[in-house]
């Protein structure tokens, strides 16, 4: 997404007369998290490039501006800077980490290398408990990640808080409503970080909590009807929370003008294709075209062991099937995609190479592998969820009546079980893994742990091990259990699952799944590992 289209998207929101805050992104890994935290206060927020000008910001009429952190130092030759006219807009500004340092430098203060960098948790000593720090307890733990610090505050600024290593941990110009914090209130490690964010949103920016699931659904339905009119829309349905929520939303907006296509490539978990058709076709009367393509996909993977080659072949075959079936079922004017706001942020290329100052483009993942369709099948896009984060999609799904089993569904990779079978994928291995995975899901649910894990699944290894069953030697496959805890999937810890749960799962798998004689538990976090094995 270019800066121009990024602005166009933001102007669409501004045209709705919705209160919003904007985050100017200087390349921080936490910019998206800041936006999510503001949304949690029921106030809309958008992440924009730091290159957004003061005039462009004025067009958006935001209630407040947040300057994100970033990997640079403000005195680097290629350090990203915001338009200095921002300080003359009369809009409250909160600078976070690098954003605070940039504020200080542009307003006449001094930033320099800290005598000692501060990384991790630090206790906040509060010097002025009013305004920004209301309800933030003295000694609160805040998350630090900086090697520079403010040496001299600009004229008009006062000290709000410090830590043992950071003399200026929070500062303010109360008259102009400019605030800066050296720590990251948006991360979960900052104990009272949300209290600070709420103070800025409600008390300093004077926002009202108007960003709700109900208002989004109403606006989205109006937008869909206005855009689509009486034309037909095609949606590739996977059964995940994103495409399912999108299907429910589109069906409520345009009814039978929507056609859902479910391509069963043979790599879903046991019972999922049947359950999907039951939920959509039978229970909710949302028409789904079921495309049975299992043999085609399995043939394409014959003899293939490289994980990237498996992904490519699955993607290419998906496009071929989608092309054939959309021609058969069409014509369609629109293709609905479940693009989410993180995808929009990723494509905005706001990262900066500190050595060259060049923009670092970020490749956006293709959605459902429909990005390579031929030109005569280039549909117009409908992307009603493009302003939502994943947790907001779940809330919308619930409000639309989506079954809880889909709303709370653990993330499942597009290539499905094909990348949870290491090495070549065969019909025999798929059956083994489906049976093992079903036991994992059954026991995790039965014992009440499903919501405790980000993901909990089984992996089939391409080796065999010796075992003994009924006084006889066995030589069969080992299954790996992979349970992880995470907030967003970007990082993850291996879950300390109860031994009783693991024992029950292990006993059931070796006794009930033919071809398996050993179960092991993966205790690798991400990083250095990844959540999926392939």
UniProtKB/Swiss-Prot annotation:
Segments forming domain GMPS ATP-PPase: 211-409
Active site: 97 (nucleophile), 184, 186
PANTHER family registered for this protein in UniProt: GMP SYNTHASE [GLUTAMINE-HYDROLYZING], GMP SYNTHASE-RELATED
Protein's organism: Synechococcus sp. (strain ATCC 27144 / PCC 6301 / SAUG 1402/1)
MF annotations from Gene Ontology: ATP binding; GMP synthase activity
Binding positions (ATP): 238-244
Signal sequence annotation: none
Domain Glutamine amidotransferase type-1: 20-210
Catalytic activity: XMP + L-glutamine + ATP + H2O = GMP + L-glutamate + AMP + diphosphate + 2 H(+)
Oligomeric form and interacting partners: Homodimer.
Keywords, in A-Z order: ATP-binding, Glutamine amidotransferase, GMP biosynthesis, Ligase, Nucleotide-binding, Purine biosynthesis
GO cellular component, one term: cytosol
Protein function: Catalyzes the synthesis of GMP from XMP.
Pfam families: GATase, GMP_synt_C
Enzyme Commission (EC) number: 6.3.5.2
Annotated metabolic or biological route of this protein: Purine metabolism; GMP biosynthesis; GMP from XMP (L-Gln route): step 1/1
InterPro entries cross-referenced by the UniProt entry: Class_I_gatase-like, GATASE, GMP_synth_C, GMP_synth_GATase, GMP_synthase, GMPS_ATP_PPase_dom, Rossmann-like_a/b/a_fold
Name of the protein in question: GMP synthase [glutamine-hydrolyzing]
Enzyme class: ligase
